């Protein structure tokens, strides 16, 4: 990751402080591949448990639970990429950014099952009648399930009055003066904006990075299918699929940029959620002919 080696030192933050840059004749100097830029660190710990059953009596399933804690001081937009990274608030103190990673999903339960219904030829019930077998035999049902806690986020100020001249891909954190977690949070207000205050100009905020958590995610996808033998190598598969079967609302992250009133106070109502992580329930019926 690149680091701005020309950021104004903390001891010299002031209005019109271009002359206090280490190299005042230049603006932001983002340098990668040097020792100062290689101080991004991460730490991951997890506990994983899985229960499985291979196909037996028509049933196959696998369910897993993962508890994990992922900490770092810098994140990118995705695994194996440097793009989209939000730079350290203070380039001279990267450790101040050490906290929950953007990818720190603390609890995750995932699983699937496939069950061949016990009806029709070769099955336990109603296995002697070819007409009955043609109607209700050979059906199988499958399901995937995901339940996981939300992703972390950081409340940030709308403008930068730190005078650090940090450039782009940078966030100025507020001061945390109270508990930002609401007992009754919702899509119209996810966290307590009154728990934050604008930092004094020329200073950095004391809020810890990624101390807030977004909405949890829950979704179940169900499929029901059967393959009909039409003639020799000609087969017809009929299936019905329901994504987000129970139509459970799973919302995206709230807006995290705070609003400031004309008096300089943090305004309420900025932590609104206007997106979903999982679309509402969709259902479809399809057929596939192979020969």
Label each PLM-derived region with a short phrase:
Residues 1-291:
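Short, solvent-exposed micro-motifs at the edges of structured domains
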């Amino acid at each position: 990751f690149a680091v701005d080696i020309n950021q104004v030192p903390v001891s010299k933050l002031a209005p019109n402080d271009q002359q206090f840059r280490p190299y005042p004749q230049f603006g932001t100097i983002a340098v990668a591949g040097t020792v100062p830029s290689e101080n991004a660190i991460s730490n991951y710990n997890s506990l994983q448990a899985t229960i499985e059953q291979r196909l037996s009596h028509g049933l196959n399933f696998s369910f897993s639970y993962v508890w994990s804690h992922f900490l770092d001081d810098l994140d990118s937009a995705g695994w194996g990429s440097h793009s989209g990274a939000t730079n350290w608030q203070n380039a001279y103190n990267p450790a101040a950014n050490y906290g929950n990673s953007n990818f720190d999903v603390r609890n995750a339960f995932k699983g699937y099952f496939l069950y061949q219904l016990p009806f029709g030829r070769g099955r336990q019930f109603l296995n002697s009648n070819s007409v009955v077998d043609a109607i209700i035999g050979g059906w199988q049902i499958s399901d995937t399930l995901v339940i996981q806690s939300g992703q972390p986020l950081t409340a940030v100020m709308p403008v930068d009055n730190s005078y650090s001249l940090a450039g782009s891909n940078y966030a100025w954190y507020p001061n945390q003066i109270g508990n930002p977690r609401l007992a009754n949070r919702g899509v119209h207000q996810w966290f307590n904006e009154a728990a934050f205050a604008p930092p004094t100009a020329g200073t950095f905020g004391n809020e810890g990075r990624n101390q807030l958590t977004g909405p949890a995610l829950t979704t179940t996808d169900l499929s029901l299918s059967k393959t009909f033998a039409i003639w020799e190598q000609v087969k017809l598969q009929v299936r019905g699929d329901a994504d987000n079967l129970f139509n459970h609302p799973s919302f995206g992250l709230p807006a995290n940029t705070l609003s400031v009133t004309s008096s300089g106070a943090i305004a309420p109502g900025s932590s609104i959620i206007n997106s979903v992580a999982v679309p509402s329930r969709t259902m479809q019926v399809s057929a596939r002919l192979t020969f």
